[in-house]
Amino acid sequence: MLSGEKILITGPAGRIAWHITQKLAQKNEVWGIARFGNLQERREVEALGVTTRHIDLATCEFGDLPRDFTYLLHIAASFEHGSYDRAIQVNAESAGFMLEYCRSAKAALIMSTLSVYKPTPAPWHAFKEGDALGDIMVPIPDTYSIAKICEEAVARFCARSFNLPVTIARLGAAYGPRGGLPLMHLEAMLEGRVIEPRWDPLPYSAIPGDDIADMVEPLLGAASVPATIVNFCGDEPVAAQQWIAYMAGLIGVTPKVMVKPVPGASVGSVGDVTKRLGITGPCKIKWQDGLRRVIEERHPGLIKVPFA
């Protein structure tokens, strides 16, 4: 576990960064920057011992933020839709400004996404790091995959230009008590809403927040010039239909699921984890256990089925 470091995390209160922030704040000097539109979330981050600053990544006006960080974790992302110009500014340009500002760091982790891969007609295809990139073609957020491809290009340039070791981690379907696609489906079931996956089956490489946090240190250790690019996702592919059925069984409801195809869109988001396994080792949490734990954290007492 990293200790005694000075670490900057963007978006520390978010569903992806929260577990990382909790873990790293135990033995390091951690700073967190974000817009912090939710004051309560900022207080929760500061309660971990994290020093915060209100900084909008659309402008990257850093004010009195120090520069002497030993590690940068750029995790914040914009999921706004409709404007590619805005999406590229907030996701891609901000990565460049962050890496330039922290160019003296030992290493940086840039969080990308499996959504950068060009869709294939095979739902269970496991994308490898060298596969073709392209627009995932989902309607919301419609700009995301293109903006993240741009972000990767900026990060690759910065690694070489600044001689700064960088890892670009293409994150799978991350989830935890603060959110994620499985949790969106859980809330839909609780509210009696229809869940509309775009294909059947619609597989993902889901990964829980605890595994994400545990793998940050080795991913930073793998940072290099040129940048290391690696899929950062769960070991066990699982279809949305599978986790919906599993969670429905735990909470005792009948889910409403209706497939709603999206022409041209990706029909699966599974990542090949061979490269990541060589860096981090295997995940510790099976998807069933991870989802059960998250439901218990988010809705105590909701689960009707005893742990087997």
Regions found by a protein language model. Give the residues of each.
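N-terminal Rossmann NAD(P)H-binding glycine-rich loop of SDR-like oxidoreductase domains
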Residues: 2, 6-26
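Mid/C-terminal beta-alpha module of Rossmann-like enzyme folds, strongest
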Residues: 191, 215-264
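NAD(P)-dependent short-chain dehydrogenase/reductase
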Residues: 123-124, 153-204, 209-210, 247
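Active-site YXXXK catalytic motif of short-chain dehydrogenase/reductase
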Residues: 91, 144-148
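NAD(P)H-binding glycine-rich loop region in Rossmannoid oxidoreductase-like domains
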Residues: 39, 51-93
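Substrate-binding strand-loop-helix patch
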Residues: 175-179, 201-213, 229-247, 285, ...
